[in-house]
Amino acid sequence: MKAIAYRGGVVTFRIPAHWREEYSDLEGGTFYEDRPDSGTLRLKVITVVAPKPLQSCSAMDVLHVVVNGMKSKGVEGTTSGRNDGNAVFKYELNSEEGVRHTIFNWIVANPIPPNRARVATFSYTMLASQRNRSQVQRDLEMLDAEIKATSFSERLGVVAE
């Protein structure tokens, strides 16, 4: 496994050592095994700002705001708090147009008092036909554990690379 210090360490997580990395200012980070039909992990990070300081904004509160609209459109998932004060919303989507894909998503909320929060969105896209392969299941278990262990810089903003 190798550590990824995304945007200089704003978000840090691990991926398999042999996976490739690509970065774009617009598209965020892309991580994948260099083989045909491999799954692709993507990461985007935003910082949200509340108009005034919040009394006790928790990561669960941030997730509620971020995913409330998704849930009203029928997206179902699981939300869990973490011991470090962050929280994760995990859900799955399936594309029905063209080549069928399954997309696993993790939204990780990181509150930054008094009135900001980082939201890291990880998505892992794969061919739907590969969903039940044992290697894919192992990759998903590994990604789930590593994403849930994601850490964030205490500094606000993009850390210089």
Functional labels for PLM-detected ranges:
Residues 19-20, 75-78, 150:
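Short glycine-aromatic motifs
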Residues 31-36, 43, 91-93, 104-109, ...:
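Short beta-strand element of the conserved SAM-dependent methyltransferase core
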Residues 121-161:
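Surface-exposed amphipathic alpha-helical segments
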Residues 39-47, 85-88, 117-124:
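Glycine-rich, often proline-containing surface loops adjacent to acidic residues and nearby aromatics
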Residues 37-44, 52-55, 96-101, 128-134:
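Short, surface-exposed beta-strand/loop "edge" segments at domain boundaries and coil↔beta transitions
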Residues 63-115, 157-161:
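Signature of long, low-cysteine stretches enriched in small and polar/charged residues
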Residues 2-64:
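Secretory pathway targeting signatures of secreted, lumenal, and periplasmic proteins
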